[in-house]
Amino acid sequence: MMKLFTKDKDGHFIREINGIKLPFPLTEFMKVRKLGYILSALLMVISLFFIITKGFNWGLDFTGGVVFDTHFSQSANLEQIRSKLHENGIESPIVQTTGSVQDVMIRLPASNNDSTIGEHVKSMLQNVDKDIQIRSIEFVGPNVGEELAQGAVYATLATLAMVLIYVGSRFEWRLGFGSIASLAHDVIITLGVFSALQIEIDLTFVAAILSVVGYSINDSIVVFDRVRENFRKIRRLDTIDIIDISLTQTLSRTIITSVTTLVVVMALFFFGGPSIHNFSLALLVGIGFGTYSSIFVAIAIAYDVGLRREHMIPPKVDKEIDELP
C-alpha cells in the first residue's frame, strides 16, 4: 500500500524540515502523480467524447433570437412571466430584471424570430400585467452569434497565451507548460460537464471560464513561488522532495481559499436565480477541478518535463578581482 505521509526514524510524522514548519505531516504528493495523470486523462477523454458526440447547447447569445425591453406597472414576477411564455409554447426564454424590479428583459430563441412576435408576446403578458409596455424589440441574427462565439474562443486562447508568457518569464518555461496543461485540463472538463448535461452556454459561461482560468493560475503561482523559495532555503534535498514540501506548506492555504470560494459560489448557485445559474455551475466545476489540478497536474507536469533546482535559481558567477596595483 502506498504511503503518503512521511515518518522519521522514530515513527513520528514529519512536521518540520530545516526549521520550516509544516501545517500538515509531510505529504508525498509526487508519489501519486501518475495516478493523478490517469484520473485526469480519463476525465478529459470522457469530456472530449461528450463534446464531440453531443456538442453544445448554445444559448441565444450565440444562436440569435429576439430581445424585448419591457416595463411593468408594478414589481414583475419573473417566474410568472416564464410560466406564461412556456404555456404559449415558447421554450427556453431568458427573463431577468434590468435596473429596477419593473424593468424586464425577455430573450426568446431564434425560432420565434418573426415580424409579429412583438404583438404575440404583449398579448401573452397582458394576462400578467395589463399595463405592460414593450419599449423596444431587437432581432439578433445568427451571424452576430457566430461573431460572439469566435470572440469567446479568441479571448480564451489569448488568456492562455498571456499566462504562458507570464509564468515562463517570471519563473521558468517548464512551469509555464505545466500551467497551460493544468488550465486546459480545467477548461475541457468544465466544457465536458456542460456538453454531457446539455446545459445552455451563453456569454456568462465564457466569463465563468475566464474566471476559472484566473483562479486556477493563481493557485499554481502560489505553489511555484513556494517551490522557488524552498530551493533557496533547502540545499541538500532533491527536487521531488522540495516540491512535496512546498505542496504541503501551501495545502492549508489552498484548502481554505477553495472552500470559502466554493461556499460563496454555492450560495450563488442555489439562491442567485436562473440568470446566473449556469455561471455559478461553471465556477463550481472549474474551481473544484482547478484546485485539484494546481496540486496534482501543474507542478507534476513541470517536474516530469525536467524542472530542476538550477532552472529556478541561476548559478552564482564568481566575480573576478582585479589585483593590479
Swiss-Prot record:
The chain crosses the membrane at residues 36-56, 148-168, 175-197, 202-224, 254-274, 281-301. GO terms for molecular function: protein-transporting ATPase activity. Pfam families: Sec_GG, SecD_SecF_C. Its main location: membrane. It comes from the Bacteria. GO terms for cellular component: plasma membrane. InterPro entries: SecD/SecF_arch_bac, SecD/SecF_bac, SecD/SecF_CS, SecD_SecF_C, SecD_SecF_C_bact, SecF_bac. One of its GO terms (biological process) is protein transport. It is a multi-pass membrane protein. Keywords: Cell inner membrane, Cell membrane, Membrane, Protein transport, Translocation, Transmembrane, Transmembrane helix, Transport. Forms a complex with SecD. Part of the essential Sec protein translocation apparatus which comprises SecA, SecYEG and auxiliary proteins SecDF-YajC and YidC. Belongs to the SecD/SecF family. SecF subfamily. Part of the Sec protein translocase complex. Interacts with the SecYEG preprotein conducting channel. SecDF uses the proton motive force (PMF) to complete protein translocation after the ATP-dependent function of SecA. This is Protein translocase subunit SecF. The gene is secF.
